[in-house]
């Protein structure tokens, strides 16, 4: 995740995928692993209370990995693993519901787990997401733009409950080592 909670993967940033030239042939500690390709010990899964059922789909594995690290465990990337996964198979890449869940669940996850002042982060995030919603209006249509608006409405309805969860959460881990994936994407830096 970057500082603003936008996820990225090794070798992929948004829809830009690097050619595999072996640049990621290593074992490395990572912040999160895709739910389609990670293993977790049952004991650790139980300690974290597993996936948060409020998420249903999208970001639930990042939330789980974050909570796992807050308990002192590590998440590792093992390059020799082979995974075959149909991306966006549940809802489809162009689904406004996917857009809604991506933005809503990101807000849920950050509110629950972010180590710093969540309200300062949310203040900046609203502006960034507004710009994204305008971009989506132009590139994907009004349904995707409105999906972001609906994500915020749902989030604000749950905010009081999320703050209660946040106050009970052990927030040890700083979630980012990259300030903004957008800057990296523009600069074409390798993640």
Predicted regions and their residues:
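Glycine-rich phosphate/pyrophosphate-binding loop
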Residues: 16-30, 163-191
């Amino acid at each position: 995740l970057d500082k603003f909670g936008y996820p990225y993967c090794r070798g992929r940033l948004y829809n830009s995928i690097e050619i595999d030239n072996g640049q990621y042939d290593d074992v490395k500690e990572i912040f999160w692993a895709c739910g389609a390709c990670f293993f977790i010990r049952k004991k650790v899964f139980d300690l974290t209370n597993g996936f948060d059922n409020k998420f249903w789909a999208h970001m639930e594995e990042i939330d789980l990995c974050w909570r796992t690290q807050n308990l002192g465990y590590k998440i590792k990337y093992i390059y020799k693993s082979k995974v075959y996964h149909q991306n966006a198979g549940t809802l489809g890449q162009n689904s406004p519901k996917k857009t809604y869940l991506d933005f809503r669940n990101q807000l849920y996850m950050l509110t629950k787990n972010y180590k710093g002042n969540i309200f300062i982060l949310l203040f900046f995030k609203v502006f960034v997401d507004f710009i994204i919603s305008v971009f989506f209006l132009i590139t994907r249509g009004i349904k995707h733009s409105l999906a972001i608006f609906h994500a915020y409405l749902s989030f604000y309805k749950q905010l009081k409950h999320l703050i209660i969860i946040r106050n009970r959460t052990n927030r040890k881990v700083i979630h980012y080592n990259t300030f903004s994936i957008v800057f990296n994407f523009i600069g074409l830096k390798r993640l």
